[in-house]
Amino acid sequence: MVCRFYDPEQGSVSIGGINLKHVVAGELRSQIALVSQHPLLFSGSIMDNIRVGNPDASDDRVKDAAKLARIHEDIHALEAGYQTLLGQRGEGLSGGQRQRMAIARAFLKDAPILILDEATSALDSESEAGIQEALAELCKGRTTILIAHRFSSIKHASRILVMDKTLAGGAIVADGTHDEVYATSALYRQLYDQQKLSSS
């Protein structure tokens, strides 16, 4: 809803007190960087795929963004480097590499609003730990919305909303920092403890 891919049937979504229905979708999206679980990559070079974040960016800026997203070394290891051609939907790259390319795009776009929708879901625990520092840097100074099932991705968020999808239409059942929702929400505590136990 924040990106206006669809509008709410009831109520409204506002940013800075402005109802998003009154904002041209294209203008709104120019202010948002989105890193999704399944990034949209296209046939073309790796350089051009990252440059989607900022079409005017120099090659050096693209490479800097790739370094911040921890994908530069993977690209550099390819025979054609940044000129390596990708197939449809990024064929030839792993899921984690595709996600890190999307993170590089977000660094390059430098938008005031950042949406991370399961942005590290395709990374193993070791790779995710390495990228968390980069994501923390990316989140600085901007409004960030994290959608995640992995608690390591959200534990340090300043505000966590816990949704219970078993309630009609899904409902927010807890709101606060990690410590606050852990103390007050049985659902959050149960899920957090289960995930912590399974990862140890």
Regions found by a protein language model. Give the residues of each.
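C-terminal boundary and immediately downstream tail of ABC-type ATPase nucleotide-binding domains
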Residues: 183-200
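Glycine-centered secondary-structure boundary/capping sites
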Residues: 4-7, 14, 70, 191, ...
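ABC-family ATPase nucleotide-binding domain "signature/switch" substructure
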Residues: 1-5, 26-41, 46-51, 56, ...
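Nucleotide-activated donor-binding/catalytic signature segment of Leloir-type glycosyltransferases, i.e.
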Residues: 75
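Conserved ABC transporter NBD signature motif
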Residues: 11-18, 28
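Conserved coupling/switch loops of ABC nucleotide-binding domains, chiefly the family-specific signature
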Residues: 9-12, 169
